[in-house]
Design a protein with these regions (language model features):
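Conserved C-terminal "lid"/linker of ANL adenylate-forming enzymes
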Residues: 5, 30, 72-124
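AMP-binding/adenylate-forming catalytic core of the ANL superfamily
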Residues: 1-80, 92-96
Length: 124
């Protein structure tokens, strides 16, 4: 089954390439693009635990670095595929919380459910 996001404007977007581009950032270990039935794309990203430890768990310290990265990668994609907002998750996505399959693929619906408050805040 293909992962396709259909925006509120009816555009079909394949999130995989955008997520791969987000994960080019040295501190980002996981990225999930959000945007199904939404006006714009956003993303939730998890920071590599070692990098987070180096920052003493201060995930806000990654905010500007990740924002610069997002601005850079957005230039590669069509306007409709631009990530407008992102949130840094306080932990990695994992199998224990049902967010990953045994082969480490992301279960989008579970991520949406588990992080609904974080996701909804980006669209307020």
């Amino acid at each position: 089954k293909k992962d396709i996001i259909i925006t509120a404007g009816g555009k079909n977007i394949a999130p995989k390439n955008i997520e791969a581009a987000l994960m080019e950032h040295p501190a980002i270990c996981q990225a999930v693009v959000i945007g199904d039935r939404r006006k714009f794309l956003s993303a939730v990203v998890a920071i590599d635990p070692e990098k987070a430890a180096e920052a003493n768990g201060d995930l806000n310290s990654f905010q500007s670095s990740v924002q610069e990265h997002v601005d850079t990668i957005n230039k590669r994609f069509a306007r409709v595929e631009h990530v407008r907002k992102f949130s840094i998750l306080p932990r990695e996505l994992d199998q224990d919380n049902g967010e990953l399959t045994p082969t480490m693929k992301i279960k989008r619906r579970i991520v949406h459910d588990n992080w609904a408050d974080v996701i909804d805040a980006m669209y307020e």
